[in-house]
Amino acid sequence: MTYALLNKIDAPADLRKLDRRELRTLADELRAYVLESVSQTGGHLSSNLGTVELTIALHYVFNTPDDRLVWDVGHQSYPHKILTGRRERMGTLRQWGGISGFPRRSESEYDTFGTAHSSTSISAALGMALGARTLGEKRVSVAVIGDGAMTAGMAFEALNNAGVYKDLPLVVVLNDNDMSISPPVGALNRHLARLLSGQFYAATKKGIEKVLSVAPPVLEFAKRFEEHAKGMMVPATLFEEFGFNYIGPIDGHDLNSLVPTLQNIRERALEGAGPQFLHVVTKKGQGYKLAEADPILYHGPGKFNPAEGIRPAAKPARKTYTQVFGDWLCDMAAADKRLVGITPAMREGSGMVEFERRFPDRYYDVGIAEQHAVTFAGGLACEGLKPVVAIYSTFLQRGYDQLIHDVALQNLPVVFALDRAGLVGADGATHAGAYDIAYLRCIPNMMVMTPSDENECRQLLTTAFHQACPSAVRYPRGSGPGAAIAAELTTVPVGKGVMRREGGARAGHRVGFLAFGSMVHPALGAAEALDAAVADMRFVKPLDVELVKRLAAENDYLVTVEEGSVMGGAGSAVLEALAEAGIDKPVLTLGLPDRFVDHGDPAYLLQQCGLDAAGIERSVRERFGLDQPKVTVASRVA
């Protein structure tokens, strides 16, 4: 496809020069460009195909970047990036040194607020609107938020706060596509569904919008009639109770409705009409039939051929840790009827699809509501159930107070299965599970476990399930080293690591590795060259202090290795144990550095952090002044 119009758009100012009749053609080109780009790099697809017209309309109507535009979550921001000067860089999307898959302030002035976690946009836009008022600047702040993100309490905290300011130029656009990642759940979603299913109300609104598109909504009769229709069909609509002027729902793919409606909203906002709430209805995957039919499959695909679609991949030789967890969850649930599973809107990503199918009455999707998920699990535990919360490491941060106050303080036996622990690759720093060891091990009553392979993951999950205290098992994205997985649900001794390699002193020194989780196997690789001992510590808390003491006694140097923040992490726990025991020993702590690690290929990112086998060996030799191994070349006799 040729991109005759799109190639002329290097900034929204170029977009605003187009005749409105050209926007439909531009939308077709932009949608095709998104599909072409994502098919070549991988990335989020369905959500971006669904926001093409909305993105065009927003930049056409609002004076960005002076008007502030905030994308909630941000995985739907590819059309925005393309229209704001990054079209030619889409080939670098989510790659090392390339553009991010999410809005990033350092990347463009049009990315007014960095996002990636959900439900933050209204708070940020409200802050920007009040900031502009404080500075005496006249502009509109716009938050674009999906219906899935509206299940989080933070969004309603912001709505509640914003409604106080009756003349504030703030606009919230609800992008209602009936999807978060997993289908959204809860009373709010049902409320929106009822809005859409009311035929008389929809017909009445259509008539009102026709009036308002001809004349701005200054006609008192039109305003009264609109309020009357709303009052009859949807009493005291939720968003108006928060102090917003509610408009919609309207078709989010109809530029002839979007543009004039947004123009009226912007005018009213600047005139002091107060916070405005526009409800648009879009379709995930719009314009690409395969994505429309299966928006979950096309939510975040890798590279694929658009003409053929995503082909089923050959069955991998090794299971992912997510699959290991999903299998364990079903097996454990079959063995113990007290088990209940909880996910904050990540059924597919957390490996709970089969569990929901087999145990629907014991499966709880609470929506994008991590705070609620943690305390809800605590309540279930109070009744004698055994809750397992499947959650990405980065998202548990959102429920930290509840973790301390509602679970750990009461010593409730909740299991947290922390997926995506460590680096996550293309999603970058916003999704990396870099901090869970540091923020969990400081909590009293908390047990923290780090499996090094698939079978150990199953064993540690079983061990966690049988504890009478809160516990967390952290495991990385992707597949493990390929360990055979035993069918039995066996436990391991609490607080005990295991030796994986006994060391020697080939070079006149002894090195002992204390490796945690995913770093056990890279440490084993480095240990071969160093003739070092390697302990698979398994537990960060309770730490195997006796094993620490043994390694300290048997080695000249100690090295801790973890795929987590080196500040406050497992290495710090080892140093504390040595200090408590009065042991003075040279220790090198290796882990993720004190910086946010960017997006890119996971193996390359680990290499950049010095956490591959070669990097670990190099760091040990440099830190302790060990000689490089001599390379001998054997002569060949003909």
Curated annotation (Swiss-Prot):
SMART domains the record matches: Transket_pyr
Enzyme Commission (EC) number: 2.2.1.7
Record bears the keyword Transcription regulation: no
A GO CC term assigned to this protein in UniProt: cytosol
InterPro entries xrefs: Dxylulose-5-P_synthase, THDP-binding, Transketo_C/PFOR_II, Transketolase-like_Pyr-bd, Transketolase_BS, Transketolase_C, Transketolase_CS
Needed co-factor(s): Mg(2+); thiamine diphosphate
Co-factor remark: Binds 1 Mg(2+) ion per subunit.
Keywords of this entry: Isoprene biosynthesis, Magnesium, Metal-binding, Thiamine biosynthesis, Thiamine pyrophosphate, Transferase
Sites where the protein binds Mg(2+): 147, 177
GO BP terms, alphabetized: 1-deoxy-D-xylulose 5-phosphate biosynthetic process; isopentenyl diphosphate biosynthetic process, methylerythritol 4-phosphate pathway; terpenoid biosynthetic process; thiamine biosynthetic process
Pathway this chain belongs to: Metabolic intermediate biosynthesis; 1-deoxy-D-xylulose 5-phosphate biosynthesis; 1-deoxy-D-xylulose 5-phosphate from D-glyceraldehyde 3-phosphate and pyruvate: step 1/1
Binding positions (thiamine diphosphate): 75, 116-118, 148-149, 177, 288, 370
Alphabetized GO MF terms: 1-deoxy-D-xylulose-5-phosphate synthase activity; magnesium ion binding; thiamine pyrophosphate binding
Superkingdom in the source lineage: Bacteria
Keyword Transferase: yes
Broad class of enzyme this protein falls into: transferase
Reactions mediated catalytically: D-glyceraldehyde 3-phosphate + pyruvate + H(+) = 1-deoxy-D-xylulose 5-phosphate + CO2
Biological role stated in the UniProt entry: Catalyzes the acyloin condensation reaction between C atoms 2 and 3 of pyruvate and glyceraldehyde 3-phosphate to yield 1-deoxy-D-xylulose-5-phosphate (DXP).
Family annotation (PANTHER family): 1-D-DEOXYXYLULOSE 5-PHOSPHATE SYNTHASE-RELATED (PTHR43322), 1-DEOXY-D-XYLULOSE-5-PHOSPHATE SYNTHASE, CHLOROPLASTIC (PTHR43322:SF5)
NCBIfam families linked to this entry: dxs, PRK05444.2-2
Record HAMAP family: DXP_synth
The protein's assembly and partners: Homodimer.
Similarity field: Belongs to the transketolase family. DXPS subfamily.
Protein name: 1-deoxy-D-xylulose-5-phosphate synthase
